[in-house]
Amino acid sequence: MRVLFYVSILVIIASVHTQLISVHVIFRHGARAPVLNVTSEEAKSYFYRGLGQLTDEGFEQARLMGKVLRDRYVNSFVDARMLSSQLLFRSSPVERCLMTLQTVGNTMFPNATPPVQTVAKPDDFLLVPKLDCDFQLGEWDNYFNLTESDKKMARKNPWFVSDKALRKAVTKTDFLQDRGGENLPALILEKEAGLAVPSWFNEGAYKESLHVFYSALAVMSSVGEYKSSKGIRIKSGLLMEKVFNDIQEKVRCHEKKEVSNIKCDIHKLQVFSSHDLLILPILETLGIREEVLGKDMPPEFMSTIIIETMIVDNSPVVKVLFRKNPREITLRDVTGFVKNCPPGQPLCPVQRFTSCCNEFITSDPKSECYAETTVEKQSEWVMTPLSWIIVAIAILLLIALILMTYFVIRYKNRSIVNIKKLSLEN
C-alpha cells in the first residue's frame, strides 16, 4: 500500500509539465578596492590594481558565479556553443562591473565569451543609479536640514550627503561614537581581506560599521528610513520595467508558439552587472530587502537576484531566487516573500508578479530626474549665428516695408494735391 502511494506521487510529479522560458540575472560586481582611499601601505600593496578596481578575490567570486550559472542554465536552457542571439549580457560602464560580467561570461562559455553591452555613464539609466536629480536635493534637505553651503556641496558631489548619513548613524553606535571621521568603508574592506587594521576596529566595531555603511548607502539608494518611491524609480525603475515587459513578451510569444510554431529564444537569458545602489532599490521594490539581507545590512559583493519565468501546466509563473554570499553555490528561493505573490508558495503567477510594483517602475527616468532642467532648456532662447542672420534679414525687410509704405503714402498725397490744383485752375 505504501509503495502504491509513493508511486502515485511520482506519477503526479511526472505529469506536471514545466518549461523554463526566460531568466533574468542581476548581480553586484565582485570584491573591489576602496573607492576613495586606503588606510595603510599594506592595503595599498594588496589593492594593487588601484582604487575602485576589482581584486583577485573579486575575479574568483565572478568565476564562481559563472560556474553557478553554467551548471544551472548552460546545455539545459541555452546552447553550450554560445549563441549570442539567446543571450543579453549588459553591464554598467564602470570597469569593475565590466570585468565581473566578462569573467562570468567566460566561465559560462569558455570557448566563446558572450559579447558584453554597455552605455556611457551619463546616458545609462538602466544600470547606473542617478544621484544628481533635482528633486533629490529637496529630499536630502528634509532629512538633514542642509545649509546653503551644504546644498552647494551636495550639488557638486552627492556623496557629501552619504557622508552626512554615515556620521548620523555613527552617533547611534557603541563602538564607533568618536570615529565618524574615520575611513570606515575602507576599513571594512581591509578587514574582510585579512589585512591589518587599527586595534579599535575590533569585531564589534566591524559589525557596527556594516550598519553604518548601510545607512550611507540607504540615503543614496532611497531605501529603508530614506525610502522614496520617486528615488527608487529613478535608480531601478527602468530595469524593473524592462524585466516585467520581457517576461510578458516571452509569455505572449510562447502562447503564439502553440499555434504558429514561432521561435522565442531571443535574449532568453539576460545577465546584468551593476552596483549595490541598484541591488538595494530592486530588493526594496520586490519587498524582500530585509528578508534576504537582514535588518539594516548592505548587499555583499556578487549579491545576485535571479528571476526565472516558466510555463507550468500551461500557466505562466515566476520563481525568484537570491544568492547572498559570494562564496555560496546554492540559491535561496524567496518567491513566497515577494510583494503581491502568494505567501510561502514556490511559484508566483506572472500577472501578479508583473503588477506588484507599479509605483516603483518607469519608462522614462531621465525626464523624472531632470524634469525642471528639461523645461528650462526648452524655454531658453539660444541665439545661433543662423538666428542672428534671420533676425537681421527680418529687420531689413521691416525697414524696407516701412520705407515703401512711406513713399506710397507720400506719392498718393502728392497726387491728391495735384488733382485739387487742376480742379481749381479749371
Curated annotation (Swiss-Prot):
Residues 410-426 are cytoplasmic. It is found in: Membrane. It is an enzyme of class 3 (hydrolase). Residues 19-388 are extracellular. It is a single-pass type I membrane protein. GO terms for cellular component: membrane. The keyword Protein biosynthesis does not apply. This is Putative acid phosphatase 1. It comes from Caenorhabditis elegans.
